[in-house]
Regions:
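Hydrophobic alpha-helical transmembrane segments
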Residues: 48-53, 96-101, 123-127, 167-172, ...
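Short loop segments and helix-boundary regions at transmembrane helix junctions
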Residues: 63-146, 243-255, 272-275, 299-300
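Structural signature of hydrophobic alpha-helical transmembrane segments
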Residues: 44-55, 93-104, 221-234, 281
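Helix-loop-helix "hairpin" substructures at the membrane interface of multi-pass membrane proteins
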Residues: 163-239
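Cytosolic-side transmembrane-helix boundaries in multi-pass membrane proteins
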Residues: 277-307
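Transmembrane alpha-helical segments in multi-pass inner-membrane proteins
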Residues: 226, 230-281
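Membrane-interfacial amphipathic/re-entrant helices at transmembrane-helix boundaries
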Residues: 10, 19-56
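Transmembrane helix-bundle core of multi-pass membrane transporters
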Residues: 34-37, 41-46, 125-184
Length: 307
């Protein structure tokens, strides 16, 4: 009863859909009941919109993250953001705003440390990763009235708490990322694959690296409500890996990965609604099955004789 339990905690009782035992959906109409309920329940519309928008942003940003081989960096930023979230929670401020500041500063700090050679990048990521989680847990526990549910909502996501302002912020970020991809796809692509070559072509690699690090941080923080800190890194990487199994073109991956992420998000949300399982886990499970299927199909094609 996970999905319905989350809803009854976050919306008024009369707004929640009727509490009844929902067994495994037995027919097509039951599966499609989710889409018909979108009209009746506003929070489902917000959840669906957030899934679509976060899928687009994570798909595009994930292409850069995977091709640049900075998945560990993205994981460090994700967990470091918990520090800002905990401090803001303790102060009574907006937790997402606190996480945003902490994540952006962490991303820029790691990028600066790596470029200056003052400290190894992997060491800096490991330090920020653990310190961020420790600071977040400490300050959240210091707030009066703290419960474990407050921590769980951010670690594993709580998609039914997505508000109109969250959707608006994701929409603005999506517009910025799409515009940036259309205008600067080639310079970003060169920077992701070979910074020395990009620098020889006159591309400002340092500026692009800092901007992309900040965008990675913003994308991660705005998607926390959907996936949670623990699972979010998979949404950034798995759609790219799925498409990369079929294509080696950066442009193709950048275009197809968001579509895969959106499809996985929506499918996971529908599964969560019908089977009463955590939305974040359902999304990752859906993407994992897709990845396994794609890998099996690609292996089968390689074994088929030509002609």
């Amino acid at each position: 009863m996970f999905f319905r339990h989350e809803i009854t905690k976050t919306v008024r009782k009369e707004e929640a859909f009727p509490i009844k035992k929902r067994k495994f959906a037995r027919n097509y109409k039951e599966y499609m009941g989710f889409f018909s309920d979108l009209i009746q329940y506003g929070y489902l519309s917000n959840a669906l919109a957030a899934c679509v928008l976060s899928g687009i942003t994570c798909g595009v940003i994930g292409t850069y993250v995977v091709c640049r081989r900075m998945v560990f960096l993205a994981g460090g930023i994700t967990h470091a953001s918990f520090g800002g979230l905990g401090i803001a929670f303790w102060m009574g401020a907006n937790p997402i705003a606190g996480a945003m500041i902490f994540a952006v500063l962490s991303a820029l700090g790691i990028e600066w440390a790596g470029s200056r050679g003052r400290i190894r990048e992997d060491s800096a990521i490991g330090i920020i990763w653990s310190v961020g989680m420790a600071v977040g847990a400490l300050f959240m526990s210091l707030r009066p009235g703290y419960t474990s549910g407050d921590l769980s909502a951010y670690l594993f996501g709580s998609i039914v708490t997505v508000t109109d302002s969250d959707v608006a912020a994701l929409a603005a970020l999506t517009a910025v990322i799409i515009a940036g991809a259309l205008l600067w796809l080639r310079p970003v692509m060169y920077t992701a694959f070979d910074r020395d070559f990009a620098r020889s072509r006159g591309i400002p690699t340092r500026v692009i690296s800092y901007l992309m690090a900040a965008l990675v941080a913003v994308t991660i923080v705005l998607s926390i409500r959907i996936m949670g800190i623990v699972l979010l890194i998979s949404l950034v990487t798995m759609p790219v890996v799925i498409v990369n199994s079929l294509s080696r073109s950066y442009r193709t991956i950048a275009l197809a990965a968001p579509l895969v992420a959106v499809a996985g998000n929506v499918a996971g949300l529908v599964v969560s609604y019908n089977f009463e399982v955590p939305p974040g886990a359902a999304i990752i499970f859906t993407l994992t099955l897709t990845l396994i299927l794609v890998k099996l199909l690609s292996l089968r094609q390689k074994r088929l004789p030509f002609g």
